[in-house]
């Protein structure tokens, strides 16, 4: 029987828990969550799902050190400000085979190399939860996008949390590259000169337009301030054009080999986290692979992103945080 742990079962962690009710192999679930209200919410969400007889047990712990000594998969769903401490404690006290981390990976640039070395030394497989890689809608276009000489990727919307969520879009563009280690450039000059505190204590949000390149792809991410406006994603390449409103579940596409005639896509576009983690867990536990980006691949984008956003926030506020205050 496999042992899966989730560290932090708050808003996102509880969705991972829900998704694990779909696993297709025998597991024991171990959950680290010191706050009883969060434990209650997590169990309420867990019990909303169909019962799975393959889940032999579910146990809550207040501390990482109380987990089983050997774990097949650990999902770290904490906020970024405590993630280094959490992961170091996990690696110091337990033998772990596989890990899934949330974004933003770490707030300190130095932490990325620290864990690159630690994961390699301990021979641990690590992935980062950028779930658009699991949306089957985009799979049908990947071959065309990866074979294109250039890809143009645009996101527009209001109050979608650029500092918090831009990495999901950048990873999406990275997925469309044929290179394993594409060169990345990020330009923050079109961001607004205003930085505001986010809902998470000690974290900030930015607005305006973030431009740059990833490999042969260019991107432009725009987030306006004030009104929540659903995001639209526009992707253009040599052979395909795609326009998506994920919030409304609407998409159109046109392909060169169909004379650029626009077609409506009428199937499901977005999958929720509560629908995805079970699939990922089964892939990892059975094959030691999954469709999420590896830690090393994700770090290629995360490192320059937190550098640029940290510079923007510190310059705007006239403060030296010594880290990138986003999560």
Regions of interest found by a model, annotated:
Residues 54-70:
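Short acidic low-complexity segments
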Residues 26, 46, 73-75, 282-327:
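C-terminal helix-rich "cap/oligomerization" subdomain common to oxidoreductases
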Residues 203, 214-281, 290-296:
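NAD(P)-dinucleotide binding in Rossmann-like oxidoreductases
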Residues 136-152:
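Rossmann-like NAD(P)H-binding beta-loop-alpha module
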């Amino acid at each position: 029987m496999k042992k899966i742990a989730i560290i932090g079962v708050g808003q996102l962690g509880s969705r991972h828990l829900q998704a694990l009710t779909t696993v297709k192999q025998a597991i024991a679930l171990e959950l680290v969550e010191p706050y009883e209200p969060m434990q209650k919410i997590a169990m309420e969400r867990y019990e909303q799902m169909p019962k799975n007889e393959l889940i032999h047990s579910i146990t809550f712990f207040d501390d990482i050190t109380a987990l089983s000594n050997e774990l097949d998969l650990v999902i770290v769903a904490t906020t970024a400000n405590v993630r280094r401490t959490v992961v170091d404690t996990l690696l110091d006290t337990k033998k772990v085979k596989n890990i899934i981390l949330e974004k933003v990976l770490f707030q300190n640039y130095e932490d990325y190399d620290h864990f690159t070395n630690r994961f390699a030394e301990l021979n641990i497989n690590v992935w980062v939860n950028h779930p658009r890689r699991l949306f089957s809608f985009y799979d049908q276009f990947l071959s065309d996008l990866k074979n294109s000489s250039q890809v143009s990727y645009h996101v527009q919307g209001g109050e979608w949390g650029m500092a918090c969520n831009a990495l999901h879009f950048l990873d999406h563009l990275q997925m469309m590259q044929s290179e394993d280690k594409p060169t990345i450039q990020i330009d923050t000059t079109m961001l607004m000169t205003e930085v505001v505190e986010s809902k998470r204590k000690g974290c900030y949000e930015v607005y305006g337009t973030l431009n740059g390149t990833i490999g042969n792809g260019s991107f432009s991410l725009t987030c306006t301030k004030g009104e929540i406006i659903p995001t639209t994603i526009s992707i253009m390449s040599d052979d395909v054009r795609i326009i998506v409103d994920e919030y409304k579940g609407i998409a159109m596409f046109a392909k060169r080999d169909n004379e650029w005639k626009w077609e409506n896509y009428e199937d499901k576009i977005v999958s929720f986290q509560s629908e995805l983690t079970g699939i990922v867990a089964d892939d990892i536990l059975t094959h030691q692979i999954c469709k999420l980006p590896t830690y090393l691949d994700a770090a290629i984008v995360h490192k320059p992103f937190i550098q640029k956003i940290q510079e923007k926030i510190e310059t705007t506020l006239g403060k030296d945080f010594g880290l990138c205050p986003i999560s």
